[in-house]
Amino acid sequence: MCGIVGYVGRDLALPIVLGALERLEYRGYDSAGVALIEDGKLIVEKKKGKIRELVKALWGKDYKAKTGIGHTRWATHGKPTDENAHPHTDEKGEFAVVHNGIIENYLELKEELKKEGVKFRSETDTEVIAHLIAKNYRGDLLEAVLKTVKKLKGAFAFAVITVHEPNRLIGVKQGSPLIVGLGEGENFLASDIPAILPYTKKIIVLDDGEIADLTPDTVNIYNFEGEPVSKEVMITPWDLVSAEKGGFKHFMLKEIYEQPKAINDTLKGFLSTEDAIPFKLKDFRRVLIIACGTSYHAGFVGKYWIERFAGVPTEVIYASEFRYADVPVSDKDIVIGISQSGETADTKFALQSAKEKGAFTVGLVNVVGSAIDRESDFSLHTHAGPEIGVAATKTFTAQLTALYALSVRESEERENLIRLLEKVPSLVEQTLNTAEEVEKVAEKYMKKKNMLYLGRYLNYPIALEGALKLKEISYIHAEGYPAGEMKHGPIALIDENMPVVVIAPKDRVYEKILSNVEEVLARKGRVISVGFKGDETLKSKSESVMEIPKAEEPITPFLTVIPLQLFAYFIASKLGLDVDQPRNLAKTVTVE
């Protein structure tokens, strides 16, 4: 199992190729690589391991290439090593090939080439293809490919690019899947449709014995004799949601249930690359966190962790406000921009502004190769996988994971604090097991028009996030507020028609928030509480309870947010709304 992708067009090839490779991860792989044509030269980067290893190798390299190929490899010929990973090139580095399948006569071909003086660098059958194409090239890549395929035996598919024709991409199919994606001023090759779904639904499925010759503006199909072939363009009925929903009714629900894995993968990713982090928070006078929406709420929780564990003053600012406010920033500050997509316009421009003022900038993104990923001085990655639902769920807890791990990195208690974080996936699993009870609570309040969410300290941002989730997908007005500020305004709204969601794990502010609950009850408010399982005191003061397992204070935000996500989901679903694509919202906001 492995994947081929190729791009030729008007946009930057690297992020497109990397993104397409991520969408082929499900096919299984042990290494990954890309090849780009940059200023007349072939740039090849390939790494054993996950795509994140490839991204690390590409870090800080701002390539402008508009043509590229990529590959995820599952070893067949040769062990999983950097050298055996694709793409493979000829001796001069002028042709690059990515290949799936098996060349059955590669040993015979390899010996012939060796006798002609060709030197091989890998143990793979794929390298034979690159050397043969280079040998057969006489100024026309298609002619060289036609000569080459006549010598190959086996089941295979491959894609090739050359520095001699930088705006050309050729793909060959013989027994291994390969499709062409048709765009406007750009065209694609891929092993499977999901890889290119974000860019086009127009597909040509190649048959065995066919060659696709692509430029940004043309697509021509030939047989192995070089004769033109007429092909039908298919409009795929798939979209990214239906292709990857995995049996769940909605993508959002699937992603809620993927959170234990997203948290675990993000923690593993952080720990495996921690030594490469080139800064210490304590070396700066201040941390500024800039973000929008759900990412802002993650940053807000991160503020509390950073101040508590790293001891560095931290501010959280909406990216849209930061850009136009007179925030003093200097080289004594570190600015962390959080964006799931890595393309959020306000966050991207705010980071650029901070960088211009001398700050050290860090991107926290879920999409490798995105603008924020490329443009920041350093990037941290969440490993949540593609998130299709517009309302962020698993990327939120993945962001929390990265922020927690970063904040405790310099703490004397680091080992104990990391052990706490390692417990979180299991605790989230336990919380997800309460979904049926949460659904019953949701059914009880689904017809309400307004709700108030209250929290304190670490769980005040969770109140904000819970309210945002409800309004995003159910269109019910909801407001998150610090519980201690209730008496300074929101208390005027509380009556028997106002459900009040109170987040109350047993932490340092537990007694205080119980007092807030009493204030709500005194005004006939209807209390929906989120608290520890077995908390009879809280239960006695609540009309409804959504329980979480007992946990240490620092990690409670990971747990308290889960029932709030489910609560919002069940209400929206029962109201018959489009949970995954709520009105007026976009997954990636690339405008101001």
UniProtKB/Swiss-Prot annotation:
Report which superkingdom the organism of origin falls in: Bacteria
Compartment list: Cytoplasm
**Sorted alphabetically, which Gene3D superfamilies does this protein's record hold?**
Glucose-6-phosphate isomerase like protein, domain 1, Glutamine Phosphoribosylpyrophosphate, subunit 1, domain 1
Q: Which GO terms describe its biological process?
A: carbohydrate metabolic process; fructose 6-phosphate metabolic process; protein N-linked glycosylation; UDP-N-acetylglucosamine metabolic process
Among PROSITE patterns, the record links this protein to: GATASE_TYPE_2, SIS
Chief location category: cytoplasm
GO cellular component terms, semicolon-separated:
cytosol
Q: Does the keyword Phosphoprotein apply?
A: no
In its UniProt record, a GO molecular function of this protein is: glutamine-fructose-6-phosphate transaminase (isomerizing) activity
Functionally, this protein is described as follows:
Catalyzes the first step in hexosamine metabolism, converting fructose-6P into glucosamine-6P using glutamine as a nitrogen source.
Keywords, A to Z, come to: Aminotransferase, Cytoplasm, Glutamine amidotransferase, Repeat, Transferase
Give every SIS domain span: 277-416, 441-582
Active-site annotation: C2, K587
As given in the record, the signal peptide range reads none
Give the EC number(s) under which this enzyme is classified: 2.6.1.16
- The residues covered by the Glutamine amidotransferase type-2 domain are 2-217
Which InterPro entries does the record associate with it? GATase_2_dom, GFAT, GFAT_N, GlmS/AgaS_SIS, GlmS/FrlB_SIS, Ntn_hydrolases_N, SIS_dom, SIS_dom_sf
Which major enzyme category is it?
Answer: transferase
Q: What is this protein called?
A: Glutamine--fructose-6-phosphate aminotransferase [isomerizing]
Subunit arrangement?
A: Homodimer.
Entry-linked Pfam families: GATase_6, SIS
Reaction(s) catalysed by this chain, per the record, are: D-fructose 6-phosphate + L-glutamine = D-glucosamine 6-phosphate + L-glutamate
